[in-house]
Amino acid sequence: MVILRHRWHELSISTVSFSFQRALLIAAHEAKLLQFDDATWQRRFGAATERVSLEEQNHLWRTLAEHPRADALVGAFAEHIDPAELGELGYALASCPNLGYAIELLQRYHAFIGDGGSLHLSQNNGLQLDYVPHYQEAQQLRVQTVLICIVA
């Protein structure tokens, strides 16, 4: 049995992976939390960069968390997450033979994808995965989304 839980913590970090931001936007669009026309999509993704400012990421999370149907994001993310949306690490995680190897790899390299946070794996009566986020904006929604990303 794997138990997923989180603890709150704060750390200063300035950028996040563009691929994670893109995956989040796609899930939000699929959940009908955000609607984009073709021109907006082109602006968002036409000039893709490797990293996105944490300020931009925080603004997106605030917008999503304030939506009356914010809970729909977690389900949409689980349904539509594709390893390709998480860049090279996503491909590496998808190629792992089991969840144990994936978590081990993720513990080492997850900061390259998202907005930080620490993953800790411990074993008592079962396995326990602790995710300690390094941010304050929309914590609950972000933690749920990250944990869905890990187990999806």
What are these regions (language model features)?
Residues A152:
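Oxidoreductase and adenylate-handling cofactor-binding alpha/beta cores
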Residues D130-L141:
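A short interface-forming secondary-structure element
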Residues M1-Q128, R142, C149:
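N-terminal low-complexity or simple alpha-helical regulatory segments
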